[in-house]
Amino acid sequence: MRWKYAAWILIAVVDVMCCSSEEKSASVSFVTRPGSQVIAFPFIFVGHSIVVLPTTKYSNLKRNAKSMEDLTFLLSNLSHVVWSLTIDATVYKDGGRLEKLFDKRMRGYLDGVSLDVLRMYVNGSKTFSELLQIVYERTFECDSRRSRQMARYGESLIREIDNMIESMPAEMSEEEKEKMRSDLNNNRKYVESFHDTEKWRQVVEAEKMVCNTCKEICLGLKEEELMGLLAEGSAKKYIKASAGESKVSSTVYPEYIVVDISLLLDAHREHGGDVTKELVKQMLLGKKEEEIDKRYIGKVANAVKERRRRGEKEIEKRVKKLLRDEEKAKSKKRGKRKSVGVSEAKEEEKKESETEEVEAGEEVEMPSEEVGGARRKTGKKSEGGRKRYKIHRRVLRWRKSPEKIKEEWDKGSEERWRGKSLEEIREQKVFHDIMGVLELLRSPDADRFFMDTGDYTKGGSERQRMVAIGVLESGGKRMLGVVEVGTFKDCPSGCPVVYHLMFRVTGIEGMGDVMRRGGGQSW
């Protein structure tokens, strides 16, 4: 085995990265610069087609069995792929001493990691993005309290390199010995970094950030837009250059980026997720590593800020128009209400009586008593001019766990909610689990924040819609939008019932006050 390590330009050969079950020896070379690192994207291609996305679960793969054999081979060697992309700066020679050492000290450990995560993927509900992050964590063991396998392997490598330096073949010329000694010393210096836990912790952190960013990008783009973004990635370019166009069409491979991870992590901490997302998009589009420096990141950050500013200006414009339209609507006479049959009205009343009254200072979980098909709180009555509302069970449902919500939906009668994934439910829960808004709605000052958009009749019951402008803070993001509250009159008490409660996003970042999900708000 001979290591190419001249002037800190690292030439790496990846033997598992581009492979198929029939032809596993294909390889692709790539170059990294000083301080740079190869990071895997959570995408897998077969030829020009994306077959695995960050959000792909194993159950999704089984529906398309065409490439399952090749995919299973790659997935069952996923830790070797990660190792080759991240560490393996070697060119193997048959029978090489360092190759044998790798087989003895490291290969078995990586095989075990691959097998464990493959079982986890097949038998669980992990997405490929989550799986890839686990592979990085287990391969580099940065949080392990025990001696890391990578560090132990590094110690063995250093001893072997020292032996190779001391026992160079006598038949070699002095010039050849000097060249070999220089290469081996460079390799030894690199292997010493195997003990640098903080360095590999940064690699794992960068991988997690890229995986999560790619997931956000995927969820926000249509399939054709995503294909355009990934039309010509780094791996595909190198396969073409190395083996030709014909090789690409039959190859299973992951995409990757070469990047200065310290620069990328600093940009994420300083500028936030929106700038990171734009940087990753540019990398997916083929932006070269040497083009991404602090100056370029600054330009991207300024462009994102300008886009936000324009968006906020447009939102303000729309909000003002909405307010004008609502004022006009309030000044007009209410149209004649449609009449409905008595039986229909009773059915609507019965359906929407499944409500729960929530008063100030009370917890939703406190004991309740059944009253005519409705659950009524037994707490204190409203005082001091505070308004009183009952809460429909469809609103209260959002306070439950995603698993419980899914269980109820799958058993329910509403067709549009059946079969929703836990991932979709978690995303929607952010915008629906905002019960803290009701505290403001009940207060005497509610009219300062909520605007009544008028009454209308549906199913024999009088309904009212109110809106308020606010900012929802969740997951480190501030989202500008409109709080929507829909109510109808309960019979026979006449108490308003909140049957619709939602935060509708109109922009990221923004003006105004902040509403925190699931509890207290600061308006």
UniProtKB/Swiss-Prot annotation:
Biased composition (Basic residues): 330-339
Listed name of the protein: UPF0329 protein ECU02_0050
Phylogenetic classification of the source organism: Eukaryota, Fungi, Fungi incertae sedis, Microsporidia, Unikaryonidae
Organism per entry: Encephalitozoon cuniculi (strain GB-M1) (Microsporidian parasite)
Sequence ranges of Acidic residues compositional bias: 354-368
Disordered: region residues: 326-386
Pfam families in alphabetical order: DUF1609, DUF3654
Protein family membership: Belongs to the UPF0329 family.
Compositionally biased tracts (Basic and acidic residues): 344-353
